[in-house]
Amino acid sequence: MTSDPVLSIRAASKTFGSRRALDAVSLDVNRGEMIALIGPSGSGKSTLLRSIDGLQTIDEGEGAITAFGGPVQARGKVSDQVRKARVRIGFIAQQFNLVGRLSLFSNVALGSLGRIPVVQGLLGWWPKETRDATMAALHRVGVSEYAAQRANTLSGGQQQRGAIARALVQKAKIILADEPVASLDPVSARKVMEILRDLNQSDGLTVVVTLHQVDYALRYCDRVVALKAGQKVYDGPASELKREKLIDIYGPEFEDVFWEGAPQ
């Protein structure tokens, strides 16, 4: 990993009505890291992730977000240069974000739209390079046999793997995954997390993933950032996140819901 962060968040705040979703959050993400964002519901995890991609504007003020050294947003306004960052950032949502009536192949091939004319892509006139990259990505995530099927006929796990494949066709250098396993059964969830971990370790992709499942955060991610009421309350190695801190983050009920063998 290099010392220069690929993502930099400085004093980012976001208010919805009277609720402070983010409260002066600062964070650097280095190239090749796999980071879990954890915290109770409403702690600001998804708001932070969407703000990093410029999908959510932060409040006016001193807050600023950069990606690859270029501006994403600052002082309550998304930069007019944000597209330069977005073409290298793959965003994976909880609800899969696939077009149900299109085949899985077409959904994944749409990742190339930043490099080919939009009309060509919308008509499905994919150049050979895109076709080859799409099949390679589908094979990489283990769903190539479903390439011709409509996305809405696939299971949630298959669709989520398709969303990851689309990020590969996009040639993303960073994957932002917002609760990617929240809607999946345990087997599918583990498979998705294993794929993200493999892309991080084998391909050097930077991954930032929001998770409700603390055990997945500790198992698959080297670094954990915890938010509580919009504030960053932990940022460090997963191996050092102990029971006492987790109870502080989630409350006393954490003892009752956490899996057997939790950190001491």
Curated annotation (Swiss-Prot):
It comes from the Bacteria. It catalyses: phosphonate(out) + ATP + H2O = phosphonate(in) + ADP + phosphate + H(+). Its main location: membrane. InterPro entries: AAA+_ATPase, ABC_transporter-like_ATP-bd, ABC_transpr_PhnC, MetN_ABC_transporter-like, P-loop_NTPase. It holds the Pfam family ABC_tran. GO terms for molecular function: ABC-type phosphonate transporter activity; ATP binding; ATP hydrolysis activity. ATP binds at residues 39-46. It is a peripheral membrane protein. Keywords: ATP-binding, Cell inner membrane, Cell membrane, Membrane, Nucleotide-binding, Phosphonate transport, Translocase, Transport. One of its GO terms (cellular component) is plasma membrane. The keyword Nucleotide-binding applies. Its EC number is 7.3.2.2. It is found in: Cell inner membrane. Residues 7-254 form the ABC transporter domain. The complex is composed of two ATP-binding proteins (PhnC), two transmembrane proteins (PhnE) and a solute-binding protein (PhnD). Belongs to the ABC transporter superfamily. Phosphonates importer (TC 3.A.1.9.1) family. Part of the ABC transporter complex PhnCDE involved in phosphonates import. Responsible for energy coupling to the transport system. NCBIfam families: ABC_phnC. This is Phosphonates import ATP-binding protein PhnC. It comes from Caulobacter vibrioides (strain ATCC 19089 / CIP 103742 / CB 15) (Caulobacter crescentus). The gene is phnC.
